């Protein structure tokens, strides 16, 4: 049997969606983690902070002794049972701490004492993180084609249909606009970058890749920003622009923001709480751009939104939303995107309807 006690082939681990039993403190995990990792800490945040303070004041031996005192008895047993259960669930998993140091070795030794031989990641999360950063930089050097178009053009759907397409908005859990958030909270910046790196590695590994197909995005997608190496390449990339009829764009937006989001909120929270969350979501999206709309126009559109919500609640009809969505597109989103696109006019290589762009992509 191959010795798995330590792992250094980091790309292979990431490509395989290798389960990681991450024993870092919750605050470290929240700041950045790898896809597929589960957080079962050796020390909680307050315990880690106490050990860190002890290390600075009294040295490594005293800190280690304090750590053993903090994690003992019932606490020790509870955490050990959690690690055992995780390994039984993921027998191909690895232990991971910050740098492959004391914490993962301690947990590994405790598991060995129960008859479980769980390998660890040599270099820990830091090594995996560096691998992800390097992979993104390397793979971003491949040619890129952007899919552009005004809001409601179906760009994301088109990207998802491409074998070499990377759904940046899906990875970011955000659709890019002020109404772009989903029910799933966004990842931390580092976790988003790690997830992006793994996606790039996977797509690159399963085909002979000539170029990436990405949606034309700004620097940020919600709270996440694109890695600079990728953003720089996107700024110079050719663009295929989707130009669908306005009415078709409205129907896509109706389906995505009024029908699907209402369904998702009520499915997650129940009818009453879900309706309140859905209403709050739409109001928040409008509120986020109030200064750009002007406060008077914002107030007018908010009144229209309130009437549309009342109509939807009473009859189920989403038609009333068109009364604020149409001016929002005409006065804000469309002019903003067209202005941005004008600055990249030299990069445009094709224009057409959604289907025409899809056919053009197949022919490339």
UniProtKB/Swiss-Prot annotation:
GO terms for molecular function: transferase activity, transferring alkyl or aryl (other than methyl) groups; tRNA 2-selenouridine synthase activity. Keywords: Selenium, Transferase. GO terms for biological process: tRNA wobble uridine modification. It comes from the Bacteria. SUPFAM superfamilies: Rhodanese/Cell cycle control phosphatase. It catalyses: 5-methylaminomethyl-2-thiouridine(34) in tRNA + selenophosphate + (2E)-geranyl diphosphate + H2O + H(+) = 5-methylaminomethyl-2-selenouridine(34) in tRNA + (2E)-thiogeraniol + phosphate + diphosphate; 5-methylaminomethyl-2-thiouridine(34) in tRNA + (2E)-geranyl diphosphate = 5-methylaminomethyl-S-(2E)-geranyl-thiouridine(34) in tRNA + diphosphate; 5-methylaminomethyl-S-(2E)-geranyl-thiouridine(34) in tRNA + selenophosphate + H(+) = 5-methylaminomethyl-2-(Se-phospho)selenouridine(34) in tRNA + (2E)-thiogeraniol; 5-methylaminomethyl-2-(Se-phospho)selenouridine(34) in tRNA + H2O = 5-methylaminomethyl-2-selenouridine(34) in tRNA + phosphate. Its EC number is 2.9.1.3. Residues 14-137 form the Rhodanese domain. The keyword Electron transport does not apply. The active site is at 97 (s-selanylcysteine intermediate). The keyword Transmembrane helix does not apply. Involved in the post-transcriptional modification of the uridine at the wobble position (U34) of tRNA(Lys), tRNA(Glu) and tRNA(Gln). Catalyzes the conversion of 2-thiouridine (S2U-RNA) to 2-selenouridine (Se2U-RNA). Acts in a two-step process involving geranylation of 2-thiouridine (S2U) to S-geranyl-2-thiouridine (geS2U) and subsequent selenation of the latter derivative to 2-selenouridine (Se2U) in the tRNA chain. Belongs to the SelU family. Monomer. This is tRNA 2-selenouridine synthase. It comes from Salmonella enteritidis. The gene is selU.
């Amino acid at each position: 049997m191959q010795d798995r006690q330590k792992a250094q082939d980091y790309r292979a681990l990431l490509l395989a969606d290798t389960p990681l039993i991450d024993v870092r403190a919750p605050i470290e995990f929240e700041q950045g983690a790898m896809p597929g990792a589960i957080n079962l800490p050796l020390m909680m945040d307050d315990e880690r902070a106490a050990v860190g303070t002890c290390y600075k004041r009294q040295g490594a031996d005293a800190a280690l002794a304090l750590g053993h005192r903090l994690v003992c008895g019932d606490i020790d047993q509870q955490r050990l049972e959690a690690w055992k259960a995780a390994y039984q669930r993921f027998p191909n998993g690895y232990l991971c701490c910050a740098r492959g140091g004391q914490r993962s070795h301690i947990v590994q030794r405790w598991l060995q004492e129960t008859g479980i031989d769980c390998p660890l990641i040599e270099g820990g999360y830091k090594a995996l993180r560096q691998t992800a950063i390097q992979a993104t930089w390397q793979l971003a050097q491949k040619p890129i084609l952007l899919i552009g178009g005004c809001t409601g053009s179906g760009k994301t759907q088109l990207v998802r249909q491409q074998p070499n397409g990377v759904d940046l908005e899906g990875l970011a859990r955000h659709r890019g606009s002020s109404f772009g958030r989903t029910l799933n909270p966004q990842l931390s910046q580092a976790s988003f970058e790690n997830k992006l790196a793994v996606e790039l590695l996977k797509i690159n590994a399963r085909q002979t890749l000539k170029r990436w197909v990405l949606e034309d995005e700004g620097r940020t997608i919600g709270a996440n920003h694109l890695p600079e190496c990728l953003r720089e390449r996107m700024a110079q990339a050719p663009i295929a622009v989707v130009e669908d009829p306005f009415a078709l764009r409205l129907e896509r937006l109706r389906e995505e923001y009024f029908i699907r989001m209402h369904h998702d909120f009520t499915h997650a929270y129940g009818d009453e709480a879900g309706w309140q969350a859905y209403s709050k979501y739409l109001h928040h999206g409008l509120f986020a751009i109030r200064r750009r709309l002007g406060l008077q126009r914002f107030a007018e559109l908010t009144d229209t939104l309130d009437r549309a919500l009342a109509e939807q609640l009473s009859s189920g009809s989403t038609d009333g939303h068109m009364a604020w969505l149409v001016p929002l597109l005409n006065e804000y989103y469309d002019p903003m995107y067209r202005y941005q696109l004008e600055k990249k006019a030299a990069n445009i290589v094709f224009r057409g309807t959604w289907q025409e762009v899809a056919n053009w992509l197949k022919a490339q």
